[in-house]
From Swiss-Prot:
Function recorded in the entry: Participates actively in the response to hyperosmotic and heat shock by preventing the aggregation of stress-denatured proteins and by disaggregating proteins, also in an autonomous, DnaK-independent fashion. Unfolded proteins bind initially to DnaJ; upon interaction with the DnaJ-bound protein, DnaK hydrolyzes its bound ATP, resulting in the formation of a stable complex. GrpE releases ADP from DnaK; ATP binding to DnaK triggers the release of the substrate protein, thus completing the reaction cycle.
InterPro entries xref list: DnaJ, DnaJ_C, DnaJ_domain, HSP40/DnaJ_pept-bd, HSP_DnaJ_Cys-rich_dom, HSP_DnaJ_Cys-rich_dom_sf, J_dom_sf
Chain positions recorded as Zn(2+) 2 binding sites: 163, 166, 189, 192
Cofactor stoichiometry and binding remark: Binds 2 Zn(2+) ions per monomer.
Entry-linked HAMAP family: DnaJ
Protein name: Chaperone protein DnaJ 1
Gene name for this UniProt entry: dnaJ1
Domain J: 4-68
Length: 384
């Protein structure tokens, strides 16, 4: 008597392929030996696997629907046959949601044509180059399209064929024993490296990779306002992918060189200006050779003190992709002379004498004012 394969899976005779697969996955989760060590469950798992093997095969299912039993008709033994596990994939899929590499839950092979990797170059820029922008001509060692096969990887008129090792799946599977029981593992096919295809007659120049290593000259436009550590992206200027795949991007990282005069802080520039003591006292004008505007006058007001900061608005670095510019901040260092000649010494002594006289006059006037005030206060109290 023919076995009731539909009953073993608990589905109707008119169940769809998806309904049959869902029923099998559910039972496999419950009965798999790694989950349920009971001997009765293991026997039931074999029956369920056999039923799925039969009903997932259109020809075998047709025999069942006609009242026959395909396994009794030479269709093969049930239980743990390779087909019964759908290449072991359906059991694995039942537990891990389609992560297996074979059967109904297999991943697609990645294919021979893959996107290329991104590349990174570093280039040194002066502060002036960062300020105005520049086009740097760089040399890069990268993967380029093979000019012999134009990326196909084949020689002459040969074409890729399905990998015999993995059957085109791109990966192979194995069952390993662990303390949890038998574990199914998948790994990329060692023959085709996950592509699912091999090339019987590969290109003599690139060896079937579709690309070769070469040195390229690249013109990299660097916009004004870049700073140290920034990366400029050049689309599709990276490495060509395996099989002639689309190239990745090239990133140019900025290495900003220190400047002799200016120190950068974001979009602002800082510098130190040495001002003679007399000029700081009387006021003066100094000229600063700015990065973008050349020689520019800076006014030092009379009485400027050491450490004060004078600002030139809009004379700093440009903001990236913006017309706005930062400021230039001049830190004033008042220089006191260490050596004086006789005339200079005499003049300074005269200045000191004048200053001392003025100070004495101020103090005398203040003293007289205080004396008059105290006298008025005494008179006020004595008159009471």
């Amino acid at each position: 008597m023919a076995r009731d394969y539909y009953g073993l899976l608990g589905v109707a005779r008119n169940a769809t392929d998806q309904e049959i697969k869902r029923a099998y996955r559910k039972l496999a989760r419950e009965l798999h030996p790694d989950v349920n060590p009971d001997e009765a469950a293991q026997a039931r798992f074999k029956e369920v696997s056999t039923a799925y093997e039969v009903l997932s095969d259109p020809e075998k299912r047709r025999i069942v629907d006609m009242g026959g039993d395909p396994l009794e008709s030479g269709g093969g033994a049930g239980g743990f046959s390779g087909a019964g596990f759908g290449g072991l994939g359906d059991v694995f899929e039942a537990f891990f949601g389609g992560m297996s590499g074979a059967g109904g839950g297999q991943r697609k092979p990645r294919g021979r044509v893959q996107p290329g990797a991104d590349s990174l170059l570093r280039t040194r820029l002066s502060l002036a180059e960062c300020a105005v922008g520049v086009t740097k001509h760089l040399t890069v060692d990268t993967a380029v399209l093979c000019d012999a096969c134009h990326g196909s990887g084949t020689h002459g008129n040969s074409k890729p064929v399905r990998c015999e090792t993995c059957g085109g799946a791109g990966e192979v599977q194995s069952v390993q024993r662990s303390f949890l029981g038998q574990v199914l593992t998948s790994r990329p096919c060692p023959t085709c490296r996950g592509a699912g295809e091999t090339i019987p007659d590969p290109c003599h120049k690139c060896g079937g990779d579709g690309r070769v290593r070469a040195r390229r000259e690249i013109a990299a436009p660097i916009p004004a306002g870049v700073a140290n550590g920034m990366r400029v992206r050049l689309a599709a200027q990276g490495e060509v992918g395996p099989g002639g795949g689309p190239p990745g991007d090239l990133y140019v990282e900025i290495v900003e060189q220190p400047h002799d005069v200016f120190v950068r802080d974001g979009d602002d520039l800082h510098c130190t200006i040495r001002v003679p003591m007399v000029d700081a006292a009387l006021g003066t004008t100094v000229v600063i050779d700015t990065i973008l505007d050349g020689p520019t006058e800076l006014t030092i007001p009379p009485g400027t003190q050491p450490g004060e900061v004078s600002v030139l608005r809009g004379h700093g670095m440009p903001k990236l992709r913006s017309g706005v510019r930062g400021d230039l901040l001049a830190h004033l260092d008042i220089v006191i002379p260490t050596k004086l000649d006789g005339k200079q010494t005499e003049l300074l002594r005269k200045y000191k004498a004048l200053r001392d006289r003025d100070r004495a006059e101020v103090m005398s006037a203040q003293s007289e004012h205080n004396s008059g005030l105290f006298a008025r206060l005494r008179a006020s109290f004595s008159g009471r």
